[in-house]
Amino acid sequence: MSEYLQQIAKRRTFAIISHPDAGKTTITEKMLLFGNAIKTAGTVKAKKSGIYATSDWMEMEKQRGISITTSVMQFPYNGRIINLLDTPGHEDFSEDTYRTLTAVDSALMVVDAVKGVEDRTIKLMNVCRLRDTPIVTFMNKFDRDTRDPLELLDEVENILKIKCAPMNWPIGMGKYFKGVYDLYNDEVTLFETGHGHEIYPYKKIKGLANAKDAIGIDLYEDLEMEIDLVRGASHEFDEQEFLEGNLTPVYFGTALSNFGVKEMMDGFTRYAPAPQHREADQRVVAADEQKLTGFVFKIQANMDEKHRNRIAFFRICSGKYEKGMKIFHERTGKQMQISKALTFMAGEREQVEEGYAGDIIGLHNHGSIQIGDSFTQGEKLKFKGIPNFAPEIFKRVKLNDPLKMKALQKGLVQLSEEGATQVFKPFISNDLVLGAVGVLQFDVVAQRLASEYNVKCSYEGVNVTLARWIFCSDEKKLNDFKKKYEVNLAYDGAGYLTYLAPTGVNLQLAQEKNPDIIFSATREH
């Protein structure tokens, strides 16, 4: 195998999906620890000590302990190159997370074993199922009193409609948690408390019978019965079914104590797929093609406090990036030279000399790159992506200093280009209406406007409950519609016509009266 093909085969690009507080940030830290990317893992709880989760680098994230922005972390493990896309963990940040799932080849689902399958996990799994993304599952928090593990497997199968294949099995739970039993290698790994910040060589005992004294006779007898039950009732691991997105290998442990994470990572790097082919409008692009192709799935403003720049997160789909190369920007039809692409470590940026399929690199962006843009080495090719989603909550922006209107508009357009929030300019007023998927996003925007653009603003209620993008191929009918409904119409930050409805009934009536107008809840980038 050539060096080029070896580099592609090494890549594992994935994201973690979970409900808030299921332990995603903690497990991210432990992975970075195993990959020698950080020296000690800072638990999210230790906010007062100034130890912050490495992936939570924006100021508000540090204060609240939540992962608002998607950062990208690359590190080596087991002879693989891991590209971990950190996804926003808090409930409010779903749209960014959805888009991130377009840039991965597999996903790790973290389930809080105390609570079971939760709402956010269901929504994220639905996005993964659209592309049949292979899923590995980690049942977390077994150092607490959790739900019954068999119940948890049933719940995953029934709610998420995916078969479960347990790879190991927990021995007890909470204060009686003794470790895990490897169902495929007949090996017990014994749990000890107090090793969450380090890589610790937990004791292993080969052969279940040899672990009887270490785990105690009562737990041993329970475990024997459970294992018989599990072997009879659950699915065996099948690699093909996993790669097709129909079956998930399940690992048990506790990320906070760094227990069970290594076993999961070993399994993940062994089974998760290398970079996969990608669908474009014109054709399917194979990962091992020689020419560089890729797409932008996120734009982040001001990752560097010293510079008011923007970084476009670019997923390489094929070919090799080399420093200084020229690429073709499909949307604008222009050539672009990339002299200083970046690789990321959650806010720490390094220039990258080369990149392969599966890698995420950062392109400096001075306003010309948008989410969903495709780049090639000359071919007219547009990758299919996940669109903008209509916001669900709306507020009017109230400016404290009217002289700062220009700075406010610039800041809001930049923030909307990141895809984290959306801004609308109504036809008949000078108002700026902000739309988001969740409430906390408004706090993020206000704080970033203050710290990055020196603009202080507050919010007022606005008589908008729904937004729909307007499309019509008949120019005359579209112009008539604009005149008739100008009180409800606005342009979004990218200049697309949008209908802002005060009520669901209002929207329904407008749709019924205008059958030739398309009212869309999504907009392709």
UniProtKB/Swiss-Prot annotation:
PANTHER family registered for this protein in UniProt: PEPTIDE CHAIN RELEASE FACTOR RF3
Binding positions (GTP): 18-25, 86-90, 140-143
Gene field: prfC
Family matches, as CDD domains: RF3, RF3_III
Localization: Cytoplasm
GO cellular component: cytosol
Listed name of the protein: Peptide chain release factor 3
Organism: Francisella tularensis subsp. mediasiatica (strain FSC147)
Domain named tr-type G: residues: 9-276
Main localization (coarse): cytoplasm
Family: Belongs to the TRAFAC class translation factor GTPase superfamily. Classic translation factor GTPase family. PrfC subfamily.
GO function term, MF aspect, one: translation release factor activity, codon nonspecific
One GO term of the biological process aspect: regulation of translational termination
Lineage top rank: taxon: Bacteria
Function recorded in the entry: Increases the formation of ribosomal termination complexes and stimulates activities of RF-1 and RF-2. It binds guanine nucleotides and has strong preference for UGA stop codons. It may interact directly with the ribosome. The stimulation of RF-1 and RF-2 is significantly reduced by GTP and GDP, but not by GMP.
Entry keyword set: Cytoplasm, GTP-binding, Nucleotide-binding, Protein biosynthesis
InterPro entries per the UniProt record, alphabetical: EF-G-like_DII, EFG_III/V, G_TR_CS, P-loop_NTPase, PrfC, RF3_C, RF3_dom_3_sf, RF3_GTP-bd
